[in-house]
Amino acid sequence: MALSKRELDELKPWIEKTVERVLGFSEPTVVTAALNCVGKGMDKKKAADHLKPFLDDSTLRFVDKLFEAVEEGRSSRHSKSSSDRSRKRDLKEVFGDDSEISKESSGVKKRRIPRFEEVEEEPEVIPGPPSESPGMLTKLQIKQMMEAATRQIEERKKQLSFISPPTPQPKTPSSSQPERLPIGNTIQPSQAATFMNDAIEKARKAAELQASIQAQLALKPGLIGNANMVGLANLHAMGIAPPKVELKDQTKPTPLILDEQGRTVDATGKEIELTHRMPTLKANIRAVKREQFKQQLKEKPSEDMESNTFFDPRVSIAPSQRQRRTFKFHDKGKFEKIAQRLRTKAQLEKLQAEISQAARKTGIHTSTRLALIAPKKELKEGDIPEIEWWDSYIIPNGFDLTEENPKREDYFGITNLVEHPAQLNPPVDNDTPVTLGVYLTKKEQKKLRRQTRREAQKELQEKVRLGLMPPPEPKVRISNLMRVLGTEAVQDPTKVEAHVRAQMAKRQKAHEEANAARKLTAEQRKVKKIKKLKEDISQGVHISVYRVRNLSNPAKKFKIEANAGQLYLTGVVVLHKDVNVVVVEGGPKAQKKFKRLMLHRIKWDEQTSNTKGDDDEESDEEAVKKTNKCVLVWEGTAKDRSFGEMKFKQCPTENMAREHFKKHGAEHYWDLALSESVLESTD
């Protein structure tokens, strides 16, 4: 009993009407449930159980009507296929070669009427507008059309009653399919009555369809003329004179009448006051329009959504709102900068025009102009072009190889002048002489220091001699006490000794203060140390790659991480079974210290606590094979760093380790270390 989708669509309007009569209101849920029952091929009992929660006591009556309609549609579909051809032929004989009916059917677009529409009590008619338009048909005109059609059918029926059985007509090429006449080539009275009723019903439906089309066209003023022509053609076909309806000119405004004093008056002369529209804020107008739009959305939900199976009318649809835009003020001096930029651009264009004009006069063209010329077409690999792209500017009209003596006019920009391009300095100055530092011996350094001190002493003596500065106090020591002071030392030796020792302490203090002033502070020493460790890597980064068989000892991990941080090295440590790769990046001095750490300072062959028990059980040969060690895989330079701060990465699989290196653009480090590990294991 399952129906196709097309049959379910035709059955849907009838089910909606039946549900509305049974429940008193339309319910899309019941309609959908009924269509599902019919579509799945349920019997009456299952369908009643399925629809009982929705219809309660009216379930059985509704199910009986539903299945009767399905059976009726199925029987009408089988009978329609058998009687379709004979009915078409008989209708043609009843109406003859009446061209008027064919015109009517061609002028109006036919509407397919479902077979379940006969069950409806009242046919649906599209309501027209309240005011009649010139292209619409009134009820009186439709009634006249019906009477004319009935009159024609009665006359044709009377003619058929006196006509003898017609002779078989030859087949015309206009007929698409040959149709056979009934036996005896005669029409029975009951059959003629059936044909007449069908024709009357079709004429009535055609008139209703035309009236609905006229009503729809009347709502569109731009299509009034076409609608009026269709209506007039149908009225002439039915033998009815169409009424003349004048089109009122509603587009013109009401004329303005002014009296002698200039006041606005109506037709009777009474003074009237016109409504003056006051300006309103744009924000208020937008707010009113927004509220009206929200109200319309609430009142009129879309029909497409209601017809959807999954539409829930309880859920409200929030309309999309435009975001508010804030004020954007121009910065001070913005337009002044734009004007200055335009003036500069104009001056530059003027200067370029003068330069190009001078170049045209002299015939000198820069090589950059030729370099900017691109080839006109792309050549495949291995193809030889007819002319090179740098020559295409000189020969714009092409190049003919058959011509023996080409004309001078064929070339562009060829003159007798010789162009001397301007000489440019190379980007890197390689002519600077490299001077090697001169290293002096200890004896030479002392001699140079004495000479410098002697020159400084002579300068002080000259200043004292000229009176620019007071003479310095004699530098008295215990050893030269008697020679410097002389008689004063003999008179009071204790006092002189105290004076000499005070001078010695004073000189010592000044010396220590000078040293303390030159001494760096703690912060300066720290910066100096960091600067010493952080080497210049602008010319390239030195990289070293190490491979360690076992790196499970946390003490060794800490040493690697701590020393890399102290030496300001970057890199990564990838932990994998039997292949632990350590990559470090930095300056040459730091790399030298880290290399000594990895290859000499750390004792890799020391047994760890967690593996000592296992090693005792293994044989000596296996212990030798699995001895832990560190190998320098590769060292070189690169342009930039690939890694950041030193970190440890645990990679259980080889693919995961390679992907980690590939993410930093250094997968070749892993490939090199892994290949060496494989070769070492095979030996």
From Swiss-Prot:
Keywords: Isopeptide bond, mRNA processing, mRNA splicing, Nucleus, Phosphoprotein, Spliceosome, Ubl conjugation. There is a cross-link at K139, K244, K252 (Glycyl lysine isopeptide (Lys-Gly) (interchain with G-Cter in SUMO2)). Residues 416-550 are annotated as: Mediates interaction with SART3. It is found in: Nucleus; Nucleus speckle. This is U4/U6 small nuclear ribonucleoprotein Prp3. Residues 73-135, 153-183 are annotated as: Disordered. Residues 1-87 form the PWI domain.
